[in-house]
Every structure is written in C-alpha cells, then in structure tokens.
C-alpha cells in the first residue's frame, strides 16, 4: 500500500508477486534467508478473517501449526500454472468457421494425441487471466470430443490389432529403466538435487526473467544434469518405494527446466 497508494490493498497479484520476488532475491530480505515474506493479518478481527478467508486460514493452520489470527503468515508466490502448451490444429469450413466434428480439431502433431484446455497454447498471453482457463476447458472440450470420436471411427486398426510384443517391449523398457535407477550408487542425494533445481528456477525463471540470468541458469541446469549421473538411489526396496520413480521424474524435470529457460 505504501508503494502503490492508488491500489490500496487491491494491488494486482502479478505486481504483488514481483514485489515479493524483489524483496527475497534482490534485497535478500526473506525471512531467515528463506524465500518467504510476512503477510500480517493480525490486525483484522477473527470473525472478519473467518468470513473472508475461512478455508485458507484452516489450510494454513493445518500445514504450519500457526494461527494467522495471532501470528503473521509466511508466504511466497507458488507455481500452479504453466503458461504455454502443445500446438493444436483445427479445420475451418467454407465460411472460415470451425468445422465441428473434424478429427483435426485440437489434434497435436502426434497422431491420436489431443490437447485441450490448459494443455494447449491458444489462450495464453504474457499473463494469465483467471477465467480463461475455464473458458478454454469448456470450449476446446466440447470441440475436441466430437473430433476424437471421428478420429477413432476412421482408424484402420484397433488396439486389439497391436502386437502383444509392443506392450511387452514397453514393460521391459521400464523394468530395465528402474533397475538401472536402483543401481545408481553415486554421491548425490536426489532430493537435494531437486531442491537445488527448484531454487534456481524459482529465483531466475519464475516471475522476473532477465537474459543474463537465464544464460547463467542454463549453465547451472547443465551442471545439475551432470550431477544427476552421480545420484545415489537412497532407497532400493521394491515395495511402496517412491524414490526410483522420483529420480526418473527428476530427470524429466531437468530436461523440462532447460526447455523453459
């Protein structure tokens, strides 16, 4: 409110997020050196907070064990939406309008793979508008479903025609992949590597992006990719063990992080 008096406490969330980012990463004033700042609601009455933010207050209290009515909240912008998406096609009729029922509608460049809603690219700009995700989900969902039925009806083969060896080969691939992961006996902790990657991306490729920092980030991601080869699979048991799957996902995260950067 001091920096943007015309907005009062109604400053847009993207502006507020950039200010929090500046406090944490440029001014180095995050709480205890961590990426978080205080949101003080203690001056508001408990009835007011329960009425306006009841659900959020309850969730925060369960996760932190602290009551925002008495102790300032610790907050930081969270990633919950990825701008951009898969390229998708469409077919126009003679009037230039969408030809409903066409198998090309919302089809990606991979035959048989369709994308709609937040997974495709068409409704994204420099900043996300809250209702656009719902709009795109409804519109592309309605348009895509009829096209999928048309695509399936026009297929020459069904899943029953696929050789069983195809599934056997896929199963063998993943069995060998996880066997390889379980055999990783290096020095790097995968969970620490994941944290390091997250810190780099949050600091340089989240809210504020600068070319120089992006170039530095690519170098750091390449370094993490090198460190990945020296991972230690800290749990090699077969039953109810999420570690090998996490390590496999971490590899994909590293690749995706570089693409995004």
Language-model regions, residue ranges each:
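An anion/pyrophosphate-binding glycine-rich loop and adjacent beta-alpha core
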Residues: 1-67, 71-74, 147-153
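Secondary-structure capping and boundary motifs in well-ordered enzyme cores
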Residues: 80, 102-112, 133-140, 189, ...
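Short FAD-binding loop at a beta-strand-to-alpha-helix junction that anchors the flavin cofactor
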Residues: 100-127
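A conserved FAD-binding loop/helix module that cradles the flavin
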Residues: 122-148
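C-terminal amphipathic alpha-helical interaction region
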Residues: 227-260
């Amino acid at each position: 409110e001091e920096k943007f008096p015309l907005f009062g406490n109604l400053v847009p969330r993207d502006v507020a997020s950039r200010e929090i980012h500046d406090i944490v990463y440029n001014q180095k004033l995050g709480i205890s050196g961590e990426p978080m700042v205080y949101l003080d609601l203690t001056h508001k009455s408990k009835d007011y907070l329960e009425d306006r933010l009841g659900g959020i207050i309850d969730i925060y209290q369960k996760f932190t064990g602290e009551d925002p009515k008495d102790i300032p909240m610790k907050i930081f912008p969270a990633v919950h939406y990825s701008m951009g998406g898969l390229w998708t096609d469409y077919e126009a009729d003679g009037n230039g309008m969408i030809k409903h029922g066409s198998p090309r509608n919302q089809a990606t460049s991979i035959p048989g793979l369709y994308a709609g809603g937040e997974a495709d690219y068409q409704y994204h700009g420099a900043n996300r508008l809250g209702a656009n995700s719902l709009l795109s989900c409804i519109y592309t969902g309605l348009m895509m479903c009829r096209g999928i039925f048309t695509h399936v009806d026009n297929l020459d083969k069904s899943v029953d025609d696929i050789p069983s060896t195809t599934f056997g080969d896929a199963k063998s691939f993943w069995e060998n992949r996880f066997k390889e992961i379980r055999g990783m006996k290096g020095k790097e902790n995968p969970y620490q590597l994941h944290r390091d990657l997250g810190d780099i991306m949050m600091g340089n490729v989240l809210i504020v992006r600068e070319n120089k920092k992006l170039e530095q980030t690519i170098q750091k991601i390449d370094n993490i990719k090198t460190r990945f080869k020296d991972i230690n699979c800290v749990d090699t048991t077969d039953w109810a063990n999420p570690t090998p799957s996490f390590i496999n996902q971490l590899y994909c995260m590293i690749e995706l992080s570089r693409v995004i950067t």
